[in-house]
């Protein structure tokens, strides 16, 4: 395709205005380069904005103050172990080693008050290392990056201007991006960073790569159509882990909200409509989605008590869930069982497995079972949050071909790049998505900028 006749030219064009794209644009912009950020539609939000905003990082000052001993190596081990050793160890190491820097950037450069989540651990974690902004949602992090970019005169943020394809020269090197609803604009670029999300809203790609989730609700934002992955594949890029995804087994059926992951970790009991437990409740919420979807009606009932609610009551996601009406309350377990039409005898047996004399067939850790009135419950189902497969990149976030060579001038991160979770939902460890998004955004923006600045000297 001809490289002449560009409507606009920039040093770097970033496609996608979520966590990865914003961080990439920030890293390149603060180095003084001319950056254009294309965003499909910020009104749709991004997955990082509606998520809990949990960034795993180690070691950090927050951990030290809390008496938590941790390291990048320990964090790397947890991620690789959870992925079944399918994640690329070089990528995992690069992200883990840069993780404390992410927390520092948000605190020291962007003014976000970060905290270490000490309310409850996460399945697969050997130490407390999830760091959050205010209210424990992702919105303050995204807003801080947007505000920072708005103050940079060398960064142009083009909202409601989706990327529509890549422009290459005769050798296959990327030279720019087509943009606009019909691809009517041609933007020249010395470097292009693909920072779109995955393909959770693309029914055709779901049917092809993740058939078990065909027709299952996706709670990610609806603009995730896999565009960047397809563009890369058209240029001969390698892809990996296309069957991988992050599930969520704690979605409040019919309410558009979800229980926070702390609830099962604090000891909630989850039963099917027959009042029977069907899996260990404290497993990862990603793989738990499959367990819930296998039950009658693809639903289950989570039961928890006031002690657990008191721990999470201040969280914005929890407030939204309560406001939605998804949580029912009662002064006794018998009343709560009646409210959800659960057989009381079966429910008693389920409780006995967790805190009584019966052995637990699922091997759950002995957690305090719901015991303090008032008792609470919610009907939950399984859903998909976002896909984990994508373009293969190196430790500098450059997009690679199957032979390991880099496609010239092309970078990828976030949902556009292969994630850290391997081929299955059980490979997902809490925070993998944001670590990959913000981390690869940092790395891509930094490397793309450095490569151009080095060439100019």
Which residues does each predicted region cover?
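A glycine-rich dinucleotide-binding beta-alpha-beta segment and adjacent secondary-structure elements
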Residues: 165, 346-424
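N-terminal Rossmann-like FAD-binding beta1-loop-alpha1 element of flavoenzymes
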Residues: 12-37
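Glycine-rich FAD pyrophosphate-binding loop
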Residues: 30-51
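An anion/pyrophosphate-binding glycine-rich loop and adjacent beta-alpha core
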Residues: 229-231, 237-346
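Glycine-rich active-site loop/strand segments that organize a redox cofactor
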Residues: 56-95
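Conserved redox-cofactor binding core of oxidoreductases
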Residues: 44, 95-184, 189, 202-205, ...
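Glycine-rich loop(s) and the adjacent beta-strand/alpha-helix scaffold that form part
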Residues: 183, 187-251, 434-443
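Extreme N-terminal leader/targeting segments of oxidoreductases
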Residues: 1-12, 30, 450-453
């Amino acid at each position: 395709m001809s490289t002449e006749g560009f409507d606009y030219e920039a040093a770097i064009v970033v496609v996608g205005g979520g966590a990865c794209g914003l961080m990439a644009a920030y890293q390149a912009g603060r180095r003084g380069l001319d950056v254009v950020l294309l965003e499909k539609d910020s009104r749709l939000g991004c997955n990082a904005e509606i998520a809990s905003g949990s960034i795993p990082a180690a070691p950090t000052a927050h951990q030290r103050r809390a008496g938590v001993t941790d390291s990048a190596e320990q964090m790397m081990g947890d991620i690789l172990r959870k992925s079944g050793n399918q994640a690329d160890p070089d990528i995992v190491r690069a992200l883990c080693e840069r993780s404390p820097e992410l927390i520092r950037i948000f605190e020291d450069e962007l003014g976000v008050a970060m905290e270490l989540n000490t309310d409850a651990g996460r399945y697969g974690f050997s130490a407390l290392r999830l760091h959050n902004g205010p209210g424990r949602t992702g919105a303050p992090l995204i807003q801080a990056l947007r505000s920072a970019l708005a103050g940079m005169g060398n960064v142009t943020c083009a909202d409601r201007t989706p990327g529509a394809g890549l422009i290459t020269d005769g050798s296959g090197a990327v030279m720019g991006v087509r943009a606009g609803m019909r691809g009517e604009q041609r933007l020249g670029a010395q470097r292009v960073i693909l920072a779109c999300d995955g393909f959770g809203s693309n029914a055709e790609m779901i049917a092809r790569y993740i058939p078990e989730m065909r027709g299952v609700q996706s709670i990610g934002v609806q603009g995730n159509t896999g565009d960047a992955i397809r563009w890369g594949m058209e240029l001969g890029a390698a892809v990996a882990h296309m069957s991988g995804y992050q599930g969520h087994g704690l979605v409040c059926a019919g309410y558009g909200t979800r229980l926070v992951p702390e609830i099962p970790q604090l000891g909630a009991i989850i039963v099917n409509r027959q009042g029977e437990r069907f899996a260990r409740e404290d497993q990862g919420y990603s793989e738990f989605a499959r367990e819930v979807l296998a039950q009658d009606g693809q639903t289950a009932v989570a039961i928890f008590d006031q002690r657990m609610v008191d721990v999470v009551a201040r969280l914005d996601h929890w407030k939204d869930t309560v406001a939605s009406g998804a949580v029912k309350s009662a002064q006794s377990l018998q009343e709560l069982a009646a409210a959800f039409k659960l057989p009381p005898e079966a429910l008693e047996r389920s409780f006995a497995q967790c805190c009584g004399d019966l052995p637990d067939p699922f091997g759950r850790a002995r957690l305090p079972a719901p015991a303090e009135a008032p008792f609470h419950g919610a009907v939950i189902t399984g859903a998909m949050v976002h896909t984990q497969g994508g373009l293969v990149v190196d430790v500098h976030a450059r997009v690679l071909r199957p032979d390991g060579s880099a496609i010239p001038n092309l970078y990828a991160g976030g949902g556009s790049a292969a994630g850290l979770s391997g081929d299955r939902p059980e490979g997902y460890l809490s925070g993998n998505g944001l670590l990959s998004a913000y981390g690869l955004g940092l790395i891509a923006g930094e490397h793309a900028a450095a490569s151009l600045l080095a060439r100019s000297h």
